[in-house]
């Protein structure tokens, strides 16, 4: 293999990594924290190691799948949006056929992991992949694609309960609802960054729908998320340390509200990124609560 061929292969792999957002782990982390919390709740603090590893790998792979299919759906629009015009598909660096092939390969890999678990998880995973494919196209038909994303982003929660328990108990849906509300809140912050560009190209979003009341609606969803996280903890009979995590959730929410007050793009992006620390805090306090109580 010549040096030129090696360079060409490495350049192509770098483009695939960019398409899959491997270079931007924030989305993977936001997807991972509630999934890990679900495993802790379902297993009362001691999840099966095999299940844990499968879900961590599955989250990484499925987040990549979601990014690929999203960029494929938006390939003709991203070129007109400042933040996305340099993405591999939008710029033409990667073909649609290459993107779909990578999506199929990663999807099959994720499904192979799921086959190591029980039949209920397999069934739920099929729904999950359908939801993942549907999401990018919801931005064309609904003013609230963030609500649909909340379902997609929370689907690992019933899957985690099913993997650990063989069923999805009622209390699992408190965590599902909490993560759904939280996702709508932070993805609306993200949508505020692109609002002007989205209006130009006809993309719908909650930031556009809420208009000048965007901050207030984000606060509503943050409060609903807090209430549902609280109910999830009460259902699992959690103690003081988890409660500290919930207080931290409120503190972070207030901080994010201050950041987005100006509606400036850098501040909204900073508020969005801050949610990684929210997820980490909730997971760590839940883990510590199970460890000590």
UniProtKB/Swiss-Prot annotation:
Q: What is its main location?
A: membrane
Question: Which is a Pfam family this sequence falls into?
Answer: UbiA
Pathways involved: Cofactor biosynthesis; ubiquinone biosynthesis
Per its record, how is this protein called by name? 4-hydroxybenzoate octaprenyltransferase
**Catalyzes what?**
all-trans-octaprenyl diphosphate + 4-hydroxybenzoate = 4-hydroxy-3-(all-trans-octaprenyl)benzoate + diphosphate
What parts of the sequence cross the membrane?
A: 26-46, 49-69, 102-122, 148-168, 173-193, 217-237, 240-260, 272-292
Cofactor(s) needed by this chain: Mg(2+)
Instruction: State if Transmembrane is listed as a keyword.
Output: yes
Family label = Belongs to the UbiA prenyltransferase family.
On whether Cytoplasm is a keyword of this UniProt record, the answer is no
